[in-house]
A protein has these predicted regions:
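N-terminal [4Fe-4S]-dependent radical SAM core
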Residues: 1-69, 86
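Core AdoMet radical
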Residues: 51-77, 81-103, 111-129, 143-155
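Glycine-rich, charge-decorated loop segments at or immediately adjacent to ligand/cofactor-binding or catalytic sites
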Residues: 130-134
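Helix-rich interaction surfaces within compact, conserved domain-sized segments
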Residues: 164-169
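Extended repeat-based interaction scaffolds and adjacent low-complexity, acidic/S/T/P-biased segments
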Residues: 173-186
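Conserved small/polar residues in nucleotide/adenosyl-binding loops
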Residues: 194-200
Length: 201
């Protein structure tokens, strides 16, 4: 993972997604949807990849910590639009999640103002009523794919979910499509299924 600075915007290149750019926050502390009512982590977030390996290095953490305050700037939306000027695909949150409705509204503005860019936003925040309106408006945009992440690691999901974890690829639930990264050493290798509404993964 490599960090890039456009004006004051800190964005990353995600190695799994063939270098597609991403804007991220620190994992868990911005992931309200990762916690059960009793305070334990939901199964899908236990052992989160974004809390291990390279994500623990200070130079990787720093941009995510800066992003948590940087998005509140008045010029953040216009700076993000400029940063995405030559991007055709963009991932929101390779770590972290939408922890604020105000942040979600700003992300929606960026999506509106960058129709040339296909946005992918995986999130667990749809379980909270206050986020459902802005997420629905995001979904209504032609250039946006919001994927609601299931909390399960055993393939359980309901109609709203667009992403679910399974421990055994042979136990793929009916109606779901297996992410090809399973067969490509953890890499997308040009596959863009995650940006379409073709299937769950």
């Amino acid at each position: 993972m490599h960090e890039r600075d456009n004006n004051m915007i800190r964005i990353s290149k995600t190695s799994k997604l063939d270098g597609i750019l991403s804007w991220s926050l620190q994992a868990l502390e911005t992931c309200q949807g990762s916690v059960n009512p009793d305070g334990t982590l939901v199964p899908a977030c236990s052992g989160c990849y974004a809390t291990t390996g390279n994500y623990n290095y200070p130079n990787v953490k720093a941009p995510r910590l800066e992003n948590k305050s940087d998005w509140k700037r008045d010029a953040w939306v216009s700076d993000m639009v400029q940063a995405l000027d030559s991007s055709r695909y963009f991932r929101w949150f390779d770590s972290g999640d939408i922890y604020s409705v105000a942040l979600a509204e700003k992300i929606f503005e960026v999506m509106q103002q960058t129709p040339w860019c296909k946005h992918w936003l995986p999130t667990r925040m749809a379980k909270f009523a206050k986020y459902q309106d802005v997420l629905a408006r995001m979904q209504a945009l032609d250039n946006v794919m919001v994927r609601f992440s299931s909390d399960s690691v055993s393939g359980e999901f309901d109609a709203r979910h667009g992403s679910v974890i399974i421990e055994n690829p042979e136990a793929l639930p009916e109606g779901a499509t297996l992410c090809e990264a399973y067969n490509n050493g953890g890499k997308c290798n040009g596959c863009l299924l995650y940006t379409s509404d073709a299937a769950d993964e």
